[in-house]
């Protein structure tokens, strides 16, 4: 491919809002162009990379026995009303109406569409299991799109959905997809981990995320030093904590006057105790489809509430901070709230680690008063949930110590169970002729996001450094002086010989200064470069490895063989 025939609008400057290297370099090197908030066009270079990512994903999915389909990007709202997600999904769901006033939406995901495709057509256990997938557009109206392709509103995703006659067979497919995803991300040359995760708006259980480890990652990942355990901070678990400090002694629950002690710090100072033996109350406003209410979450005084866990505990769509006025209106006492003696109309949850704890200190539900000698017993089991945020240094369940690293999510697999099939009436007849809902799995990969992730994982201060598997071209030939007939002819012959061997070549035949051409080579990041210049008079060319910019002189007679050997 001649550079003069390729649309590559490279620039020296990056957009002001481009803070991450991947965002800066993909725009500067002409891989993508922004047309709106969170909206990007893929240009020829970007499309070449995107196609290679798609082909790797498609190859491994096909090998795993999945069938590729293409579902409509515009979805009737009625399908989402059947699953009860039409209003539950929130503002990220872009809803619209046609000229007949019918409800439609731009698909952020396709569970409803795939169920509609299969129900009434797959009717017997003999037709199961079935796995359908697609690679196509999605739209989520992100409140704050940022970081280029890493968090945009329109994106390309591989989403697969499997249907099963039993939970055991769903688990088998889930494990197969974990293996398949491992193969995909390994072929892309990424340093990644499969981590335990929260299911989010998709729902279901048995959720795992695939995280590429990167210092600029948005997600915190907890990793054990004793095993392969890894989890997103929203789903991380730990061993029950212990405290060596002396526990406050009290034969019975007593109420103490604690004026001005409305924080854990002041309470621990007042009673001269470790915060481990205190209980913190966190009050949130839980928002539901058609209502909202104040919910209280109780954790140890030295713990923090993990909001995703809390949101799942009370089955809310989302949580927001409750104002002091809202807290008081609900009959609560800010700064002095405790689990014992709460008004019966208050919804509350207690962290699992507090169950059966004795001689604790907490608010007495009366201004300026705390209770000591509080025993967390005789509460309904349903009140206890995993609420505390796991931190670096906590003990893992495997006995190791947990540390925190950063990651970028590139894939997510779920065991949905019967959530969608039950609500949408998708059933089959089992071997006994009994009607049952499908067990479903859901498997996603952020295909367009992977383009940015690969740059984030492999770049230097000058530009992209593409791995061979997904590079837009394999060899970049730079002709120092296109007016030199000998240089141009050698470059054209090298291009022809490489292309006839199946090697993708970019030949820079522009009438530009050599410095401009070299800067573009470094910016675009093709794995291997060949500079054809004055050295050709001595039968030499310069060979460059983009990773490290190592340059060596190579005989012009040997360069073709060297390139074929390393490629």
Curated annotation (Swiss-Prot):
Free-text note regarding domains: Consists of three domains: the N-terminal catalytic domain, the editing domain and the C-terminal anticodon-binding domain.
InterPro entries cross-referenced by the UniProt entry: aa-tRNA-synt_IIb, aa-tRNA-synth_II, aa-tRNA-synth_II/BPL/LPL, Anticodon-bd, Anticodon-bd_dom_sf, Pro-tRNA-ligase_IIa, Pro-tRNA-synth_IIa_bac-type, Pro-tRNA-Synthase_IIa_type1
EC number: 6.1.1.15
Keyword Metal-binding: no
Provenance organism: Campylobacter fetus subsp. fetus (strain 82-40)
Aminoacyl-tRNA synthetase among keywords: yes
GO BP terms, alphabetized: prolyl-tRNA aminoacylation
Primary gene name: proS
Molecular function GO labels: aminoacyl-tRNA deacylase activity; ATP binding; proline-tRNA ligase activity
Compartments in which it is found: Cytoplasm
Family: Belongs to the class-II aminoacyl-tRNA synthetase family. ProS type 1 subfamily.
Descriptive protein name: Proline--tRNA ligase
Keyword annotations of the record: Aminoacyl-tRNA synthetase, ATP-binding, Cytoplasm, Ligase, Nucleotide-binding, Protein biosynthesis
């Amino acid at each position: 491919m001649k550079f003069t025939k390729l649309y590559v609008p490279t620039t020296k400057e990056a957009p002001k809002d481009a803070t991450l290297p991947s965002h800066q370099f993909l725009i500067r090197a002409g891989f993508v162009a922004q047309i709106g908030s969170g909206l990007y066009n893929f240009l020829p270079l970007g499309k070449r990379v995107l196609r290679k990512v798609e082909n790797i994903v498609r190859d491994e999915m096909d090998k795993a026995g999945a069938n590729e389909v293409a579902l409509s990007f515009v979805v009737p709202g009625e399908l989402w009303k059947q699953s009860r997600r039409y209003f539950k999904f929130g503002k990220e769901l872009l809803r619209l109406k046609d000229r007949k006033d019918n409800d439609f939406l731009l698909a952020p995901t396709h569970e409803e569409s795939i169920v509609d495709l299969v129900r009434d057509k797959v009717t017997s256990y003999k037709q199961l299991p079935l796995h359908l997938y697609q690679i196509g557009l999605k739209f989520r109206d992100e409140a704050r799109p940022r970081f280029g392709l890493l968090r945009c509103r329109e994106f390309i995703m591989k989403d697969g959905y499997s249907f099963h006659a039993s939970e055991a067979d769903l688990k088998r497919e889930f494990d197969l997809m974990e293996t398949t995803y491992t193969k995909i991300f390994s072929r892309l040359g990424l340093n990644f981990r499969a981590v335990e995760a929260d299911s989010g708006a998709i729902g279901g259980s048995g959720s795992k995320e695939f995280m590429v480890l990167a210092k600029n990652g948005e997600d915190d990942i907890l990793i054990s030093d004793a095993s392969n355990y890894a989890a997103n901070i929203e789903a991380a678990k730990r061993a029950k904590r212990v405290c060596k400090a002396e526990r406050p002694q009290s034969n019975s629950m007593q109420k103490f006057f604690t004026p001005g002690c409305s924080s854990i710090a002041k309470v621990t100072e007042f009673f001269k105790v470790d915060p481990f033996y205190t209980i913190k109350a966190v009050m949130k406003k839980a928002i539901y489809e058609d209502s909202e209410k104040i919910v209280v979450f109780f954790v140890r005084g030295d713990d923090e509430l993990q909001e995703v866990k809390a949101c799942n505990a009370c089955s809310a769509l989302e949580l927001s901070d409750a104002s002091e006025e809202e807290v008081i209106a609900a009959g609560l006492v800010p700064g002095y709230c405790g689990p014992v003696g709460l008004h019966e109309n208050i919804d509350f949850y207690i962290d699992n680690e507090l169950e059966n704890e004795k001689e604790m200190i907490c608010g007495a539900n009366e201004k300026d008063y705390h209770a000591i000698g509080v025993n967390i017993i005789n509460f309904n089991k349903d009140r206890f949930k995993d609420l505390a945020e796991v931190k670096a240094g906590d003990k893992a369940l495997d006995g190791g110590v947990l540390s925190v690293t950063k990651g970028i999510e590139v894939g997510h697999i779920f065991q949905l169970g019967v959530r969608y099939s039950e609500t949408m009436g998708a059933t089959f007849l089992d071997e006994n002729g009994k009607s049952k809902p499908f067990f479903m799995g859901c498997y996603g990969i952020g295909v367009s996001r992977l383009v940015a992730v690969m740059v984030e994982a492999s770049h230097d201060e000058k530009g992209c450094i593409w791995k061979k598997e997904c590079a837009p071209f394999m060899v970049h030939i730079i002709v120092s002086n296109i007016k030199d007939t000998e240089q141009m002819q050698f470059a054209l012959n090298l291009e022809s010989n490489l292309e006839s061997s199946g090697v993708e070549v970019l030949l820079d035949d522009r009438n530009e200064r050599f410095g401009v051409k070299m800067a573009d080579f470094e910016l675009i990041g093709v794995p291997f470069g060949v500079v054809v210049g004055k050295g050709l008079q001595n039968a030499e060319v310069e060979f460059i490895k983009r990773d490290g910019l190592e340059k060596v002189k190579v005989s012009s007679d040997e360069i073709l063989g060297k390139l074929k050997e390393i490629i």
